[in-house]
Amino acid sequence: MKRAILLLLHLGKSYTEEIAAAAAGLDLALVGLSSRPEEPTVLDGTRRHLADCVVTEEAELRSGDVEKALRELTDRGYRIEAVLASFEGYRLLMAEFNEKLGARDSTQAALRLCLDKFELRRYLFAEGLSEVRVNRLAPGAIPDLDPDTRWFVKPVRGASSFATFVLDDIGDLAELPAIQEQMRADRRMKAIFMDRYDFLVEEYVEGPEFSFETVVLDGRVHHLCVHEKARVERLERTTLEGMSVSPPASIDRELVLEGSDHVTRCLAALAGRGLTAGVFHIEVKYWESRKRWEIIEINPRMGGSLINPSTQTVTGYSLLDLWTESLLLPDGERDAFCDRLTRASQLEALRTGAPTRATVFLSKYGEKGRTIDEIRFEPPTRPPRILRLHVVEGTELDASDRGICLMDALWDVAADDLEAETAFLDRHAAEHFHVRYR
C-alpha cells in the first residue's frame, strides 16, 4: 500500500501542483477527490499532479463522497493517512476525516466557531478580547442601531468579500434578500456558505487592517508573516483588498508586535475549544480611536491571492508545505518543527530587530457581469516577479457582489523604504494595467 494524502478539490482546483510537491517531499502520494467542474477540461491539468483522482457528479463535496472515495482509493492500493482542503468550504470535511484518520488537526467544533463570524465575535467579546458590538440581522426586521456609531454589514459565513459594506443608510438592508439569492446561485462560492445565508451588523472598526499568516501545532502559535492591506477599495456592496505589503509600512514595530500578541491571546482562548492545529489567515484591525487591536476574521486556511508566495519570499517557507507536513508530523519531530518556524518568523525578526525581506503585491478587480475584450499588464520597467492573469479575452465575469480578481502581481521591495515603494507601485500599476470590456 502506498502512503497518501487525500486532497479535496472544488470544481477541479486546489493548489494541486504545490501540494503535490509538498507531498512528494514527504514521500507521500497525493490523490484527489473533486466535485465536478462545469468544464471537464479543467481536470486535465489537475490530474497531471495527482497519483489518482475520483470525481463526483455534483458541484459540491459531501461527507458521503469522502467516505466513498476513501474506500475506492484504498481498493486501488493507497493508504490514506490525512486529508487536506485549501478550499474553505471543505475545511470541516477535512477536520472530520482527519479525526477519523488520526492526523493532526483542529476539532470541527472549533473550526465551525471560527467560520461563524457572529458567534466568533460573541465568544471573543465574552472572553474580554473584543469590544465590538454585534447584532444578527433578522429577515425583514430593522435593527435598533446607535445612530452615532458607524456599522458594517457582512455575511455570517463569508467569502471573497461577498456583500461586505459600511452601512451608510439603514434602508440599504432592504437589498439583503437579493444578495442572498446571489449567494445561493453562485456555483463557485456556494459551498463556502455551508447553507448559511444570514447576515450580521457590527461596529465598524476604523483603522488600518492587517493579516497574520499563522501556523498552529499542538496549541503552539507561530506567526510566520504579517501583511498590511495598504490599499482598500470600497465599492457599492463589497470591500476589495487592492494592495498588501509585508512587513507593515504605516505602523511601527512595537505596534505590530502588540497586534501579534493580541492574536496569540485570542488563539489561546480558542485552544480550549479545540483550535490546536492548522494554518490560519487571521484578519485584524487596529482600532485607532480606542488604541486596541480587534480580530476581524479567523480564517482556518491559507490566505488567497499571493499571500503564500509573499510569505515564502519573506520567510523561506511555503504555508502549503508546512500545512502538509504538520498533518502527519511524528511526535518526536514537533520541537524541531516549531524551532524552524521560530527561526523563520518575520515577527520574531521584528521582535529582535533582525533584518527582514519585504514584498508588495497588488490585485486588480473587474466589473461584475462584464465581458473582457482585452487585458494586459506590461510595464516597461520594474516588472513584477510574479504575475498572474486570471482572465483572458472573452471571459464573462460573474454578475456577483463579490471580489472578481483579474490580476495579481508581486514585487520584491526594499524593506527600509516601504512607503515610497508602495506609492510608486500603486502609480506604476494604475498607469500600466489595462482592461477593456465589450
Language-model features, listed with the residues they occupy:
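ATP-dependent carboxylate/phosphate-activation module, predominantly the ATP-grasp catalytic core
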Residues: 203-206, 210-269, 275, 299-328
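Conserved metal-phosphate-binding beta-hairpin within the catalytic cores
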Residues: 214, 250, 267-311, 344-346, ...
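Conserved ATP-binding module of the ATP-grasp superfamily
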Residues: 130-132, 170-206, 239-242, 264-273
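A short catalytic or substrate-binding loop motif that flags glycine-/basic-rich loops and adjacent residues
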Residues: 157-159, 204-207, 273-278, 354, ...
